[in-house]
Swiss-Prot record:
The modification N6-acetyllysine is found at residue 609. Belongs to the ATP-dependent AMP-binding enzyme family. ATP binds at residues 387-389, 411-416, 500, 515, 526. The lineage of its organism: Bacteria, Pseudomonadati, Pseudomonadota, Alphaproteobacteria, Hyphomicrobiales. Catalyzes the conversion of acetate into acetyl-CoA (AcCoA), an essential intermediate at the junction of anabolic and catabolic pathways. AcsA undergoes a two-step reaction. In the first half reaction, AcsA combines acetate with ATP to form acetyl-adenylate (AcAMP) intermediate. In the second half reaction, it can then transfer the acetyl group from AcAMP to the sulfhydryl group of CoA, forming the product AcCoA. It holds the Pfam family AMP-binding. GO terms for molecular function: acetate-CoA ligase activity; AMP binding; ATP binding; metal ion binding. SUPFAM superfamilies: Acetyl-CoA synthetase-like. Keywords: Acetylation, ATP-binding, Ligase, Magnesium, Metal-binding, Nucleotide-binding. It catalyses: acetate + ATP + CoA = acetyl-CoA + AMP + diphosphate. This is Acetyl-coenzyme A synthetase.
Length: 651
């Protein structure tokens, strides 16, 4: 654990929105009287009909969660219309293309026009309030227009990351019974085309076999590449928006009406459709965006995530736009054309706040400081990290080399299910410790418990729970509320269990130690081990598979697969490569296995349960303390696994 402390910078303290005194006061108010606290802060967004009920939540029984429930509002209105009178000509979105010579700026007035036109196209084709629209797009402004257009008319968007395979896309279309898809001819990443329309066509065929029929596909032209075309079903975006009016009144939405579904990996194979609603989500994302990033009017904010993940939803689109910020959308990757790209973009667009993932930082750190030092980065005043815990070495590099000791780092911890940031430093209030997410945001009450559910006080190491609701919290798993209750509220009764392990130090700072369930965190992306296992087992030569994570110098966690083959098959390099390709096709590049170990058998108890603890230890090249193996049906299996491990450290 890092013992270093970096006190609040004088420059940050001088112009901050929240200093330590205010943090302590507000935090106390927020946990002692959440009703009063959120009644005040709920007014940060505009309401067509103001709420009179603030908080109506319980973590027991059926876990009903309602915030501002009798208020009427609209997310699209709050992100666009309310800014037009005073800031219509301000840049809302800076788009930086994959090609460093291509970019564009979209003002709030233009954003209104694009979003209203797209909303009218959706209405023209029969999309109405409550309908699910799947968005499978690259990082282009039209992805944000699509989200905001859905929100404008009350349709529920389900954004699917453009790196997911046709099979993964189909599963998400089927689960929410989406009949309208918005996609693009091709995406571009690192100079390479990505066949999004082709993937969409394949996904629609797969979905049709499961009796979910997609009626319309709206296609944005990005590259002009050749695409298949289904007349009557497929329609061009540019043709459609030219034929509709540039105004579309926002639908008055109840605070608890659904806003979006976002699929995330569970410890079972089937992805969960995490459901977020309208009012509480927007209050929370706009508030965390303002206070965690100490956002000042007119600043340029760049979150490097993809809109296919929750970070992109909350901190590229909804949070910044609700606050009338200028938000930067980046189509490319950190190492194209070379490893200096991030820093060049910061200079080019005078970025003030930069929010990225530790994975990206570790890989850029490995490329050498010269790429950073080519740029001035003089506009930067705040740095942030998201997606996974950051190791102290990468934190120090980020602080000293990228930030030149002038920019505080907000190491933020949160999840798809939380809607927004839960634990994070505030730049003008919190002394920093490299690797620690530090203290809870307003209204967030963390608690550490041991495996039996006993509450741990003071400095301790345990499982991280949250004991009361906050407005940004997910309300359900789409179409399966029981799964929501079982996944998050049954392990420790009356508490939201995050699935993360955590340490609290003597100063009350929180240190996230990683997942305690069967979910991997690969490059900041959550991936269920069961998903990867079922992809492997779907290959005709594979009999059984077990997947665990292991420490990876760049990705944080790597994917280590133990594979047992069908009788008569033998594992070789060619099959290993074939299985890697197979998993990529089934799930997407994010799930690419790092190590595949062929094994004659897996370590199982006599009742047939795989002992993953042993597999994790071997994958970590740490088998000196495997613990009790007396319950194993065949202890000899372990010796073979150790002898043939793929991750041995060179001695």
């Amino acid at each position: 654990m890092s013992a270093k402390i970096y006190p609040v910078l004088k420059s940050a303290k001088a112009r901050t929105l929240i200093d330590n005194e205010r943090y302590q006061k507000w935090y106390q108010e927020s946990v002692e009287d959440p009703e009063k606290f959120w009644d005040k802060h709920g007014r940060r967004i505009d309401w067509f009909k103001p709420y009179t009920k603030v908080k109506n939540t319980s973590f027991k029984g059926r876990v009903p969660i309602k915030w501002f429930e009798d208020g009427l509002t609209n997310v699209s209105y709050n992100c666009i219309d309310r800014h037009l009178k005073t800031h219509g000509e301000r840049t809302a979105i800076i788009w930086e293309g994959d090609n460093p010579y291509i970019d564009k700026k979209i003002t709030y007035n233009q954003l209104y026009d694009y979003v209203c036109r797209l909303a009218n196209v959706l209405k023209k084709h029969g999309v109405k309030k409550g309908d699910r629209v799947t968005i499978y797009m690259p990082m282009i402004p039209e992805a944000a227009y699509a989200m905001l257009a859905c929100a404008r008319i009350g349709a529920v968007h389900s954004v699917v990351f453009g790196g997911f395979s046709p099979e993964a896309l189909a599963g998400r279309i089927v689960d929410c019974e989406s009949t309208f898809v918005i996609t693009c001819d091709e995406g571009v990443r690192g100079g390479k085309p990505i066949p999004l329309k082709e993937n969409t066509d394949k996904a629609i065929d797969i979905a049709a076999k499961q009796y979910v029929i997609v009626n319309k596909v709206l296609v944005v032209r990005r590259t002009g590449g050749k695409t298949g075309w289904a007349p009557g079903r497929d329609i061009w975006y540019h043709q459609e928006i030219a034929t509709v009016k540039p105004d579309c009144p926002p639908v008055k939405m109840r605070a608890e009406d659904p806003l979006f579904i976002l699929y995330t990996s569970g410890s079972t194979g089937k992805p969960k459709g995490v459901l977020h609603t309208t009012g509480g989500y927007l209050v929370y994302t706009s508030m965390t965006h303002e206070y965690v990033f100490d956002y000042k009017d007119g600043e340029v904010f760049w979150c490097t995530a993809d809109v296919g993940w929750v970070t992109g939803h909350s901190y590229i689109v909804y949070g910044p736009l609700a606050n009338c910020a200028t938000t930067l959308m980046f189509e490319g990757v950190p190492n194209f054309p070379d490893q200096g790209r991030f820093w060049e973009v910061i200079d080019k667009h005078k970025v003030n706040i930069f929010y990225t993932a530790p994975t990206a930082l570790r890989s850029l750190m490995g490329a050498g400081d010269q790429f950073v030092q080519r740029s001035s980065r003089e506009s930067l005043r705040l740095l942030g990290t998201v997606g996974e815990p950051i190791n102290p070495e990468a934190w120090e590099w980020y602080y000293h080399v990228v930030g030149e000791d002038k920019s505080p780092i907000v190491d933020t911890w949160w999840q798809t299910e939380t809607g927004g940031i839960l634990i994070s430093p505030l730049p003008g209030a919190t002394d920093l410790k490299p690797g620690s997410a530090t203290r809870p945001f307003f209204g967030v009450q963390p608690q550490l418990v041991d495996a039996e559910g006993n509450v741990l006080e003071g400095p301790a190491d345990g499982n991280l729970c949250i004991i009361d609701s906050w407005p940004g919290q997910s309300r359900s798993v789409y179409g399966d509320h029981q799964r929501f209750v079982d996944t998050y509220f049954s392990t420790y009764k009356g508490k939201y269990f995050t699935g993360d392990g955590c340490r609290r130090d003597e100063d009350g700072y929180y240190w996230i130690t990683g997942r305690v369930d069967d979910v991997l965190n690969v490059s900041g992306h959550r991936l269920g081990t069961a998903e990867v296992e079922s992809a492997l087992v779907s290959h005709h030569q594979v009999s059984e598979a077990a997947v665990v994570g292991y420490p990876h110098p760049i990705k944080g966690q790597g994917i280590y697969c133990y594979v047992t083959l069908m009788a008569g098959q033998s594992g070789d390099y060619a099959l290993r490569e074939e299985l890697v390709k197979h998993v990529r096709n089934e799930i997407g590049p994010v799930a690419t296995p790092d190590k595949i170990q062929f094994a004659p058998g897996l370590p199982k108890t006599r009742s047939g349960k795989i002992m993953r603890r042993i597999l994790r230890k071997i994958a970590e090249d740490d088998f000196g303390a495997l613990g009790d193996t007396s319950t194993l049906a065949d202890p000899a299996v372990v010796e073979d696994l150790i002898a043939n491990r793929q991750n041995r450290t060179a001695s």
